């Protein structure tokens, strides 16, 4: 993918995520009311990987509207979280305020993060459904390396890539497992609300 194609892809991706935010906030998938009341968004596998994070500096990449970021802060971490979607970051800040939690939310293309952030982190965290949207995993890995303290940890919890072989209805294999192209999805609604327009 050339630079122009990459920027086009990133802008399309940003617009897509901006369009999903309101639907996701209202969906049962994200259980926002329960979350504000104290329910964590983190599942057992990532909680086990994270362990005791009290006082640790964590960078959360591709945070959407911040549920996992806020959950990490509730566990005592000092959290900085980044997302491409400006709308998601606005809503993340509102959600953090409703939860009474302090998180530094940054709106940025993850590849350009070094232009707006200078810190180093004990842990870099990312979760579920993030790598399929990235047009350049090598460049993403360099971002992680740049922000990680010596002896720091990168913790990623992600779906197995075999999931990306299936069609949008998950009924048949439609894509090559070894594909190096970005994923392009065409469907009605969002993964959190299939009725969303």
Where are these regions (language model features)?
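Conserved class I S-adenosyl-L-methionine
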Residues: 1-54, 67, 153-189
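Class I SAM-dependent methyltransferase SAM/SAH-binding core
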Residues: 57-113
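A short acidic, Gly/Pro-enriched loop at the edge of an enzyme's catalytic core
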Residues: 115-124
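Residues lining the SAM
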Residues: 126-128, 157
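A short His-aromatic
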Residues: 132-133
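A short glycine-rich, Lys/Arg-flanked "PGG" loop and its adjoining helix->strand segment in the class I
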Residues: 138-153
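A conserved mid-domain beta-alpha-beta active-site/ligand-binding segment of alpha/beta enzyme cores
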Residues: 193-197
């Amino acid at each position: 993918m050339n630079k122009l194609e990459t920027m086009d892809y990133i802008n399309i991706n940003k617009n897509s995520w901006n369009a999903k935010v309101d639907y996701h906030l209202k969906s049962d998938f994200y259980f926002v009311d329960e979350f504000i009341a104290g329910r964590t968004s983190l599942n057992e596998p990532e909680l086990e990987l994270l362990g005791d994070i009290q006082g640790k500096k964590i960078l959360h990449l591709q945070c959407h509207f911040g549920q996992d970021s806020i959950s990490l802060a509730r566990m005592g971490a000092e959290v900085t979280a980044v997302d491409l979607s400006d709308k998601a970051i606005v809503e993340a800040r509102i959600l953090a305020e409703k939860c009474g939690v302090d998180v530094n939310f940054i709106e940025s293309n993850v590849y350009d993060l070094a232009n707006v952030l200078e810190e180093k982190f004990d842990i870099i965290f990312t979760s579920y459904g993030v790598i399929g949207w990235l047009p350049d995993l090598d460049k993403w890995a360099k971002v992680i390396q740049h922000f990680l303290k010596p002896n720091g940890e990168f913790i990623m919890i992600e779906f197995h890539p075999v999931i990306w072989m299936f069609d949008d209805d998950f009924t048949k294999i439609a894509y090559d497992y070894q594909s190096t192209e970005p994923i392009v999805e065409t469907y009605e609604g969002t993964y959190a609300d299939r009725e969303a327009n």
